[in-house]
Amino acid sequence: TNVVVTDPLSWQYFGKGPVAYGSLFQGEVYDALREPAVEGWSTASYDASAWKSAHEVALEGHISKAGNPNMPWVNDYSGFELIGQFGQTVKQINELTALSVEEVRPGVFVYDMGQNMVGVPRISLSGMQPGTEITLRFAEVKYPDLPEYEGNIGMIMLENIRAAMAQDIYIAKGGQETISPRFTYHGYRFIEITGIDKPLPVESVKGIVLSSIHELASHYETSNARVNQLWKNITWSSYGNFLSIPTDCPQRNERLGWSGDISVFSRTATYLADVPQFLRRHMRAMRDVQRTDGRFPDIAPLGGGFGGMLWGSAGITVPWECYQQYGDTALLSEHYTAMKRYIQYIIDQTIETETNLIVQTRSWGDLCDWLGLEDEKNDKSLVWEAYFIHDLDLMTKMAAALGKTSDAAWFRDLHAARRDFFNKTYIEPESGKTIFSAFIPDKKGQPVDIQTSYVLPLAFGIINEENRNKVIANLAETVRRENTTDRGRLCPSYSLMTGFIGTAWISKALSDYGLNDLAYRLLQQTDYPSWLYSVEQGATTIWERLNSYTHTDGFGGNNRMNSFNHYSFGAVGAWMYNYSLGIQRDEAYPGFKQFILKPMPDPTGKMKYARGYYDSMYGRIESGWREERGMIHYAFTVPGNTTATLYLPAASLRDVREGEKLIRKCKGIEYIGEGSGQVVLKLLPGSYSFEVKKEYPMAGKKRKKGEIARSKGTH
């Protein structure tokens, strides 16, 4: 075997090629007049006599000169080890064509791509004078026609990209040529082009969409067109922010791997696309910058940030989601020591001896329920405690999965103790309302009583049996009533008052405890604050704020801190798959070898159907339901070499038939049990259809005389 390599000291470089400048944040400068100097550079006949020899540079020094005590970056190159690239590569996944062009000022042409996208342009030119300088600038939105924006109306809005210049400069050579940057990327819907005398045809302006998500692994569709657009917005924000690392946003001078964002979105991500290697790479980045005391960073790579426990918990939740979705313990094994060190850090460094409360300082972070509309009314220690208990629950299960029985027992005991502490500290036993702890001494014992304060302990199974029904009722009340924001704005019933953290769990908490009607009302609410409010305002991606833009108030004064491509509020996507479609993992069988089908039709009747699929490692799982003439029709597909546990709403097995046949006589269907208005069946591989009276989706509802459920199936 011959191994052919080159000596690095024999490498050469040419410093005056057409790419004069390239930066992810600032854009690219390309001088096409320099192209002849490097034409044919990779051929044997090319004359490289003018090229210079490369020389070795030590990997030392600092990554950034910026200094911020609240964002302690891993800033020293020393100790860094170069490794081979792994994860999911960035590639072109789509190509868009501009829909329209407007000359907003003389010589200033703005093209609308019709979709907020992430990538680079591909612009065809001809007949340009050599040396002509063409400038491209990129924006997600334009200034609307409102009095406060007089003088800028119709121009692209660049305030929200802050210190990122995000522009490309192209110096033309003449003839047929193409502008297509290689050493940058942009988040944008609108392209401003200057330096040309007249507008280019819209078909000459393309958008090359880049992503580490190469294709979707799922689909979701309903009778509600706005909900369908919301799902599309979630997918586009996933495309745009899964770019080598899971970023918070793709356009401004940030584009960082904020851990809180991927923590709340990881379950949705695993259903949207096949991302195990992408997330495994990110967990490597989190370990690389884990502090010596065990604290996970709030940003990875590089580290730093000021998010706190809820952000650091990504180091626990993401491995768990990957394990459950893909059934592979490899990530658990390589990440386990880091997770255990993190738990020990919480115990040693954040639990106050005198009060037993988890206490955080600004040096670690206190973002809490970021951008929640009632966040200032919350007891932050309640949220921190709930997440710590959730982390302990996951660690118990992951330790057991790895056969670490003594660790699992330790985590289980600690989980039980902290769960008991939560119920005694944060729940008023008579009313079941959440209350302030001694974290804020002058408020101790006063009610918190906001959505997030109930959502987290319910979603995480923290509330004990004595308090549970009262806490559920209190959560329901916070959803049904009008609420007032921290800034004094009155919001209508069925408003989404939660931030990044609470929003990820609110629909699950409602559906887990029989409040599906409220979950669907929240999903389909169009008034502010809600998921569909942004859809009503023309959004094509998920926004950082629920009101990043409105037709009446423009940007509401949030011009700078305002991303229009931020997937965190899109974490509701997991509920769409897990509850609306009912495609759920079976925790006892990670990876969908065995799984659960538990669809929950809309009890309000506003949504008439939902259907979709998830492409598991074993094949496509399909689920759907539709309401028609007083009946709910269900359809499922179970892929080969798997089995599904189906929870079908019906009063008893006697009411479930295949045509006129009893279920016990149907091939591919096995009876498991019944109760609480549900019949539980085991489905072998095949396609199935069932129908039940509309009343049945409300679990526990009594069957009226003469009502039956019918089924048809093939396997």
Which residues make up each language-model segment?
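Active-site acid/base region of carbohydrate-active enzymes
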Residues: 2-20, 190, 200-233, 239-240, ...
